[in-house]
């Protein structure tokens, strides 16, 4: 028997076919969220205050400093925040110190800075009662980047860009004549030498002395420069030129130019490279990173002893560079100090490191390599040394020295996680607040003012609220199942503020890059316009302090070439320097390689190389893919397009009533379920004392009792049912981090997205055509694929001009039968079964006072009370929303609930539906093999096996060959073996069961060796002609259910302006009869059908009502009138100043009557407006989902009587 037994958690053992030993545990899968937020709370927030403070007033009299901050206890717990539609947040208090420099007086005060949203343990935020996830963003890293493009003659043109975190961009470029230019902040270009002169190096000799006189592009640029032979101060002239480019039309002076350039580049408040920008810039420009492979044109000696380190003519190898590195790190080695002229922007001396080498393109030419000195990582702004060194790099590229950058390389793209995104948002708020504080400082009396009076927290609160509420990266959490949650938290988006837009992103950005290996999943990405822009973090990847993605590798000892268990995490640009063996390379027990030649990766190349060259080895075969992709068994046998669909569709699997973990899994299911946040996890070790459906109590070793409350029938974001079930028994010992209770889509601690039905690949009466699925009625009867869905509905009683709305049982014109499940307040009881149109909350709204008729006056005189003028505005069950009332929540002002202004009472009703699998539901396996149910076949009619077992699902064999997802067949056969042997299997991706293992397992289970069997037709008892592949496969029911999609309308709401029916199920709209459908009717000459579609059934408002009357009264249907949209068109053309008239056959003008001029009793504009006013409350529910044009849900009075 191949394989070995492995325990997953305490409750599940599987036979695993993996051959590679796990040297590294999977990390906590949501640490990208939690670590980033913790950093923000501990360091990021303080950094922000230190950046903005101290704030000084314009006269320098007052100074406001930051001392400390603290977060107090949150107002609500996580569950309370969810229930009250509130935020899970804690009050932020900041201690500020105000110093009066004139009197020396110091005032300290604690200032409230608003409520700050807290992250839950699951890595989410609760905003307005809904769980949200902040998606990490993938952006270009700040730094300096060089690019190369060939012109039409095939000559290389180089360009460079300095990208800051915030501030002005600096770009270099050469034109067709090889003259170099610079652009500041995307303005017009100016010769590069003008920038050098503005930095204080005014004469041509200084420039040639610094950069070397042999550079062709430099001499051409100097020739082009207008100040070439100017006698007066060239520095000032250059400054004026730059000012003219940046501020055209304004009077130019050297002083204004200096202050403008200082503000643009050298003011830390305006220009920020961030630590990562400084790190990247130093890595690109420092001398020690640029010498490798160059031929020295001077002898290098130790400055202290004079010992020769390298001779002129030596080529710098790795060994020589290692020897030189300690010297290159010194401040006094090959360092030249240049002093700019006094008119320069920055007058401090500039220290550069400079070494002469020979040009690669012309080995007789000597060119300098200039490094930017030793600028510490704390310097977040650009320095003149950076600009000069980057210009030198630019000139050197034309000599063949240095390399251009690939912007899609993950060394040049970084992750902005929650913490940094929040920090940036907070910075915006604080910067707005700073302006207000400065203004208040100058207005208020300095002797009496306190910090509290200066601070206005509104901009800070608003920017945080805006970020959580409406940022593109703050998303409503995908809560279909635990895998969907987990993947959402690990998602990386290139979209969003400061990122790309869908329309501008080309193929290169979206494509898989070799640096994605072990960092971003090459498989899991959406289909459609976002493909390649939204990615998923690989399973072992982590994000370092600079925001670059790292992936772990096992170090290979360079002495004896053995693989050690020492793990190094490498970023993409570090990895480029190493050769890395694959995880499945055969090893001996002592860690040495079995073969002398092994397959390895060198950048984007796969090579076979000697063991001596190997630096690292992969940690695990699954480090390449994300968690969802790693859940697909036999992934290596599937075509990547189908694997992509498989990974995406697992996230859409609906939690079933009684799920089963897959018989054939990959072994990552336990970790995925554990880290997703839906399971109940033990915090500390102990012994289980009590278990029921609602709570588990664990006695800790020190005697304290921990009570874990389980989640019961909670509605998730996606309207699914989230429920926890205990899996531990009384007396059982649990360790910290053990699973105590399964969440939704879990079984025995493992992810269980679907079921393991018996599947045959066969055709059946054409019901398999085009990916359709024929299923056994047993799956319906036994609730195998039954799921519970919970929908919530709200009704608010508001204060109106005519008096308050009232929740009551006494609703006008409603029979007792409709009120049978309502209590005295008109609210439905929990447990009642409701159907479409039933009342959930009885509510009446006061109507306007009207003139009383004689009869009403008589009644009023007799009974002394006016018959109540109210309208029925009850909340009713919408179409397709019937079910069992699962919960009712009532919020009132008296109970201290926070309600929006004008609302007295709010009732929320939860309706649970039990949905069995039915025709039209979408199902899928894990290999992208999706289809819809086409027929439910009675159990007795299904094909059955020789032992009488009927098949559960029949799939079309045509769905396999062309799609090349062969993994489903291997899963089918191994699943059959597991089913017959009564065990669970694990076959990890890229390291799972081989073909031989699968057939050995089939043979061991006693099933025919080819995995096929004779099936008998359930209707005739005859055997089918050929043997059929039968087995067990994990099959899911997806969230695309026919109940949510089916929709029908006779009459309903119309759009206000065009009077055409609305569209879409959410608005109870009609089916659009579009341009092409009209052509089809025209082709048949179906004139009358076409006419009624364009008039009665659409926007002929008068005709609609008359037609309705005629049908009711059994009369012939009248002639149609003029469609409203035609009138709209005429009015729009008239608004353009065109004289539009409608003429008849005799060229006589037809007067189009307005709707309210019609003599018949029809619905006119005023009636519609009044009706809309009355029904506003009714239609509040639709407003959220209403994605159409500005619509008003108005239904004609008469039409609505039915």
Swiss-Prot record:
Compositional bias (Basic and acidic residues): 1171-1188
Lineage per the UniProt record: Bacteria, Bacillati, Bacillota, Bacilli, Lactobacillales
Family the UniProt entry places it in: Belongs to the RNA polymerase beta chain family.
One Pfam short name: RNA_pol_Rpb2_45
GO CC terms in record: DNA-directed RNA polymerase complex
Region called Disordered, residue ranges: 1154-1202
EC annotation from Swiss-Prot or TrEMBL: 2.7.7.6
Segments forming a coiled coil: none
Role this protein plays: DNA-dependent RNA polymerase catalyzes the transcription of DNA into RNA using the four ribonucleoside triphosphates as substrates.
GO MF term list: DNA binding; DNA-directed RNA polymerase activity; ribonucleoside binding
Catalysed reaction equations from the record: RNA(n) + a ribonucleoside 5'-triphosphate = RNA(n+1) + diphosphate
InterPro entries listed in its UniProt record: DNA-dir_RNA_pol_bsu_ext_1_sf, DNA-dir_RNA_pol_bsu_external_1, DNA-dir_RNA_pol_su2, DNA-dir_RNAP_su2_dom, DNA-dir_RNAP_su2_hyb_sf, RNA_pol_bsu_bac, RNA_pol_bsu_CS, RNA_pol_bsu_protrusion
Subunit details: The RNAP catalytic core consists of 2 alpha, 1 beta, 1 beta' and 1 omega subunit. When a sigma factor is associated with the core the holoenzyme is formed, which can initiate transcription.
Protein name: DNA-directed RNA polymerase subunit beta
Keywords: DNA-directed RNA polymerase, Nucleotidyltransferase, Transcription, Transferase
Biological processes per GO annotation: DNA-templated transcription
């Amino acid at each position: 028997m191949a394989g070995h037994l492995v325990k997953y958690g305490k409750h599940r053992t599987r036979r695993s076919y993996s051959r590679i030993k796990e040297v590294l545990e999977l990390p906590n899968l949501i640490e990208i969220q939690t670590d980033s937020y913790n950093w923000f709370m501990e360091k990021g927030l303080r950094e922000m205050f230190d950046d903005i403070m101290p704030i000084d007033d314009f006269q320098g009299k007052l100074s406001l400093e930051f001392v400390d901050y603290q977060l107090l206890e949150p107002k609500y717990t996580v569950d309370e925040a969810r229930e009250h539609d509130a935020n899970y947040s804690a009050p932020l208090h900041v201690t500020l110190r105000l110093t009066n420099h004139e009197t020396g007086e110091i005032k300290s005060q604690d200032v409230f800075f608003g409520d700050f949203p807290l992250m839950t343990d699951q890595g989410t935020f609760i905003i307005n009662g809904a769980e949200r996830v902040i998606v990490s963003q993938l952006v270009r890293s700040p730094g300096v980047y060089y690019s190369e493009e060939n012109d039409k003659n095939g000559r290389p043109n180089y360009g460079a860009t300095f990208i800051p975190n915030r501030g002005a961009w600096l770009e270099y470029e050469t034109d067709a004549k090889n003259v170099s230019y610079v652009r500041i902040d995307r303005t017009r270009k100016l010769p590069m030498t003008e920038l050098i002169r503005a930095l204080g190096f005014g004469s041509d000799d200084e420039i040639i002395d610094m950069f070397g006189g042999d550079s062709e592009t430099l001499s051409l640029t100097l020739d082009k420069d207008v100040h070439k032979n100017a006698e007066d101060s060239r520095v000032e002239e250059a400054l004026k030129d730059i000012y003219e480019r940046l501020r055209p039309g304004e009077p130019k002076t050297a002083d204004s130019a200096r202050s403008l350039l200082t503000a643009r580049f050298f003011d830390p408040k305006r220009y920020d490279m961030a630590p990562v920008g400084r790190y990247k810039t130093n890595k690109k420009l420092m001398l020690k990173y640029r010498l490798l492979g160059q031929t020295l044109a001077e002898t290098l000696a130790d400055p202290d002893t004079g010992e020769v380190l390298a001779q002129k003519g030596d080529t710098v190898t790795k060994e020589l560079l290692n020897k030189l590195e300690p010297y290159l790190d010194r401040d006094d080695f090959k360092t030249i100090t240049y002093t700019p002229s006094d008119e320069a922007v920055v007058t401090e001396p500039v220290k550069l490191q400079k070494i002469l080498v020979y040009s690669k393109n012309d080995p007789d030419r000597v060119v300098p390599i200039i490094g930017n000195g030793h600028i510490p990582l704390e310097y977040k702004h650009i320095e003149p040394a950076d600009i000069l060194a980057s210009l030198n790099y630019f000139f050197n590229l034309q000599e063949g020295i240095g390399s251009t950058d690939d912007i899609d390389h993950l060394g040049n793209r970084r992750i902005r996680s929650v913490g940094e995104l929040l920090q940036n948002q907070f910075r915006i708020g604080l910067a707005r607040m700073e302006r207000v504080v400065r203004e208040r400082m100058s207005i208020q009396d300095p002797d009496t003012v306190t910090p509290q009076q200066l601070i206005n927290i509104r901009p800070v609160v608003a920017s945080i609220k805006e970020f959580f509420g409406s940022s593109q990266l703050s998303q409503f959490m995908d809560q279909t199942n635990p895998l969907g949650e987990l993947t959402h938290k690990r998602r990386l988006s290139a979209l969003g503020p400061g990122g790309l837009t869908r329309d501008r992103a080309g193929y290169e950005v979206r494509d898989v890059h070799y640096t994605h290996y072990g960092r971003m999943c090459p498989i899991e990405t959406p289909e459609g316009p976002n493909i390649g822009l939204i990615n998923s973090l690989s399973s072992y990847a982590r994000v370092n302090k600079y925001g670059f993605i790292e992936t772990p590798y096992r170090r290979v000892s360079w002495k004896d070439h053995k693989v050690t268990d020492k793990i190094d995490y490498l970023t993409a640009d570090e990895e480029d320097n190493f050769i890395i063996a694959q995880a499945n390379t055969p090893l001996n027990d002592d860690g040495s390689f079995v073969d002398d030649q092994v397959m390895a990766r060198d950048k984007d190349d796969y090579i076979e190389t000697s063991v001596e060259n190997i630096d690292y080895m992969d940690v695990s075969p699954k480090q390449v893919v994300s968690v969802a992709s790693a859940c697909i068994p036999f992934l290596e046998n599937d075509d990547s397009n189908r694997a992509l669909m498989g990974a995406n569709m697992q996230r859409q699997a609906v939690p079933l009533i009684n799920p089963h973990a897959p018989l054939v899994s990959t072994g990552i299911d336990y970790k995925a379920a554990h880290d997703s946040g839906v399971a109940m996890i033990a915090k500390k070790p102990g012994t289980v004392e009590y278990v029921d459906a609602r709570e588990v109590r664990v006695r800790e070793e020190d005697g304290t009792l921990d009570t874990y409350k389980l989640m019961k029938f909670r509605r998730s974001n996606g309207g699914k049912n989230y429920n926890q079930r205990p899996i531990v028994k009384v007396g059982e010992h649990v360790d910290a981090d053990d699973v105590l209770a399964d969440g939704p889509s879990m079984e025995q601690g493992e992810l269980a997205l679907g079921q393991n039905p018996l599947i045959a690949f066969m055709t059946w009466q054409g019901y398999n055509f085009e990916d359709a699925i024929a299923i056994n009625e047993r799956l319906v009867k036994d609730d195998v694929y039954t799921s519970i869905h919970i929908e919530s509905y709200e009704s608010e009683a508001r204060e109106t001009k005519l008096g308050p709305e009232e929740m009551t049982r006494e609703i006008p014109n409603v029979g007792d039968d409709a009120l049978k499940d309502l209590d005295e307040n008109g609210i439905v009881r929990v447990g009642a079964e409701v159907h479409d149109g039933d009342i959930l909350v009885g509510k009446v709204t006061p109507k306007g006072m009207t003139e009383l008729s004689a009869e009403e006056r008589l009644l009023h005189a007799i009974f002394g009370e006016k018959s109540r003028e109210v309208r029925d505005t009850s909340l009713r069950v919408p179409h397709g929303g019937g079910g069992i009332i699962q919960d009712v929540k009532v919020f009132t002002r008296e109970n201290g609930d926070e309600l929006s202004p004008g609302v007295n009472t709010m009732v929320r009703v939860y309706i649970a539906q039990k949905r069995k699998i039915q025709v039209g539901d979408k199902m899928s396996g894990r290999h992208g093999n999706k289809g819809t149910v086409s027929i439910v076949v009675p159990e007795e009619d299904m094909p059955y096996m020789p032992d009488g077992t009927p098949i559960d699902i029949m799939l079309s064999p045509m769905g396999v060959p062309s799609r090349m997802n062969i993994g489903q067949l291997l899963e089918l056969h191994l699943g059959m073996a597991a089913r017959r042997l009564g065990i669970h299997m694990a076959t990890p991706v890229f390291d799972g069961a081989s073909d031989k293992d699968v057939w050995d397992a089939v043979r061991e289970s006693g099933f025919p060796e080819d995995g096929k069997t004779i099936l008998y037709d359930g209707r005739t008892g005859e055997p089918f002609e050929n043997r059929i592949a039968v087995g067990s496969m994990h099959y899911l029911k997806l969230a695309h259910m026919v109940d949510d999609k089916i929709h029908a309308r006779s009459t309903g709401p119309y759009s206000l302006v065009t009077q055409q029916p609305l569209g879409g199920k959410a608005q109870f709209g009609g089916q659009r009869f579009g341009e092409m459908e009209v052509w089809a009717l025209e082709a048949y000459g179906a004139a009358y059908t076409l006419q009624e579609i364009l008039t009665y059934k659409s926007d002929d408002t008068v005709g609609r009502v008359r037609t309705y009357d005629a049908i009711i009264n059994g009369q012939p249907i009248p002639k149609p009138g003029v469609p409203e949209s035609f009138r709209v068109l005429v009015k729009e053309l008239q608004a353009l100043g065109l004289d539009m008239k409608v003429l008849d056959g005799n060229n006589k003008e037809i007067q189009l009557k307005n709707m309210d001029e019609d003599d018949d009793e029809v619905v006119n504009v005023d009636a519609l407006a009044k009706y809309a006013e009355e029904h506003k409350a009714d239609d509040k529910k639709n407003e959220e989902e209403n994605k159409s044009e500005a619509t008003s849900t108005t239904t004609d009075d008469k039409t609505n009587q039915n």
